Amino acid sequence: MSRRIVGGPRAVGLVLIAAACAGCSAPAKAPAAGGVMARAVVDPYLKVQAALVADSIDGVRANAGAIATAATTLGAPAVKIDTAALQLAAAGDLAEAREKFGTLSEAIDTYMTGLKLTPPEGVRVAFCPMVQKPWMQDGSTLANPYYGSSMLTCGSFRN
């Protein structure tokens, strides 16, 4: 007895594709416009910012990796965050970490602006006129991660 496949070769192809992707999970969607930036990105970002303010790279690699992992859950618009975080994780010294942190900060700022997201409560966005880059930080006293102790209060808050 022969079996007839209902739907023909195209249907079989679709079934095979569906079966192959059964274990696949679609990336999470970006936060709704007008929402709050994901804490999974912001919390490790703030740890990196604090380390750079202290003229240190302790914990930068691990926290940048956490940012990259979190960014992958935000969907396609966050690909620049993921890429910048991975570059920061590979930084070999303080100067390079600060440079890559600037790239990451710009990527996050662009993502947040594009989706009209705000930082979580208590987190503010600041801007350094010397490097022309933003950063996020806790608290109301400027703590510039691009220059650390040499120019700790250089910059201004945007929000």
Locate each region found by the language model:
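Bacterial N-terminal signal peptides that target proteins for export
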Residues: 2-16
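Bacterial signal peptide processing site
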Residues: 25-27
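C-terminal motif of bacterial Sec signal peptides marking the signal peptidase cleavage site
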Residues: 19-23
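Mature extracytoplasmic or organellar-lumen-exposed domains after removal of signal/transit peptides
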Residues: 34-159
